Design a protein with these regions (language model features):
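Cleavable N-terminal export/targeting peptides
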Residues: 1-57
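Short loop/turn motifs that connect adjacent beta-strands in outer-membrane beta-barrel proteins
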Residues: 67-77, 131-136, 193-200, 232-246, ...
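Transmembrane beta-strands of outer-membrane beta-barrel proteins
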Residues: 77-82, 139-141, 198-202, 223-225, ...
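Residues that define the transmembrane beta-barrel architecture of outer-membrane proteins
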Residues: 75, 121-125, 179-185, 215-223, ...
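Residues on the lipid-exposed face of transmembrane beta-strands in outer-membrane beta-barrel proteins
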Residues: 70, 81, 127-135, 141, ...
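Outer membrane beta-barrel transmembrane domains
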Residues: 247-336
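Transmembrane beta-strands of outer-membrane beta-barrel pores
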Residues: 83-89, 143-149, 193-197, 204-210, ...
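Transmembrane beta-barrel domains of Gram-negative outer membranes and organellar outer membranes
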Residues: 35-178
């Protein structure tokens, strides 16, 4: 069954995306302080390029020291709206039903479900609020909504005790589709540093997603290292765009997602009328449960992205993922 697919979607919201760029200070080239915006927009600008406010904000802590070294720090607070689309393959280890019976006869071992290829697709929209607590450290919280589906190739066998297992033709080569939706929330932090126009960042976050067809929540941990370079872009008078910054990077995303899912059979729709009738008969009391164990075919994928810093207060970001997990990410951010 395709219940396992939800893991993928968790991971997608768990990616509270951010990126940063550090610039060598106008003075003291040996400085180790680097700062950036919440998204890859976090780019440091030399002090002479941007006028600092007359009364520097309290955050980030040690911000005065960074400014004294010639760095222009981004506004401390940010609001980010993100959209992410993920498609990935999943391997299912086992699917088990329990709580089934025909009268007083238990039928927990009646069905044997063999699962082939499984493909999951999900879309997640999130809103993230962040704050720079240190010139090189950003923390954030996020909340969002995930919606998607999975499709699995399955074959169902029926166990007949000492008679062995039969595989009815009408229960083989089925396409099992599972639709799901849920709310995702979480928190994370990003560390950044750089030399000249080169920058490196490390993002880590933890999320929980509550799905409409699962018991409890699904937990996910995501770790994303990135390395990139910052370019200065000319202004475009015809579009009233000032000179900006363009950050490009490569990276990788690691996902560790809870791999066991449980729920009620009443929330599932079987892929064929024949199988649905058999499950309904064995689950006449409505106590049937499912338990799915699975794992991602690959916890890592490759990322390529870019961020355009339009003004000091606004930037847009996009990122693509490929290899075992295909993903598309786009975000707009306002800093204040």
């Amino acid at each position: 069954m395709n219940i396992f697919i939800r893991t993928a979607l968790v991971s997608l919201p768990c990616m509270a995306f951010q990126s940063w760029a550090a610039m060598t200070p106008a003075t003291s080239p040996a400085s180790l302080y680097h700062y950036q915006d919440d998204s890859p927009a976090a780019i440091t600008t030399p002090a002479e390029e941007t006028k600092q406010p007359s009364s520097p904000p309290v955050l980030p802590f040690y911000g005065d020291e960074a400014r004294a070294r010639g760095y222009d720090l981004p506004a401390p607070f940010g609001v980010n709206i993100n959209y992410m689309n993920i498609r990935q393959n999943i391997s299912v280890d086992s699917i088990a039903f329990s709580g089934l019976a025909l009268g007083s006869i238990p039928l927990d071992n009646l069905f044997k479900i063999n699962v082939g290829d499984t493909r999951e697709s999900s879309k997640t929209e999130t809103v993230r609020l962040d704050v720079w607590v240190l010139p090189f450290m950003n923390v954030y919280g996020l909340v969002g909504h995930t919606k998607g589906h999975s499709v699995s190739d399955i074959g169902v066998g029926v166990k007949l005790g000492d008679l062995g297992e039969i595989k009815p033709d009408n229960l083989q080569n089925l396409k099992f589709r599972l639709d799901f939706k849920g709310t995702t929330y979480g928190a994370g932090t990003t560390f950044a540093g750089g030399i000249g126009n080169w920058f490196a960042l490390l993002d880590a976050n933890y999320t929980q997603t509550r799905f409409d067809i699962l018991d409890g929540s699904i937990d996910a941990f995501t770790l994303t290292p990135r390395v990139g370079y910052r370019f200065t872009t000319p202004g475009v008078d015809a579009l009233y765009l000032p000179a900006g910054k363009l950050n490009v990077w490569v990276g990788s995303m690691y996902q560790d997602v809870q791999q066991e899912f449980k729920g009620s059979l009443n929330d599932l729709t079987m892929p064929s009328a024949g199988l649905q009738e058999m499950v309904d008969m064995a689950n006449s009391k409505g106590k049937g449960r499912f338990d799915v164990k699975q794992h991602l075919k690959s916890p890592w994928n490759v990322l390529v992205g870019a961020q355009y810093v339009i003004t000091r207060n606004f930037n847009v970001t996009t990122e693509f993922g490929f290899a075992e997990r295909n993903s598309f990410f786009v975000a707009g951010e306002y800093r204040f």
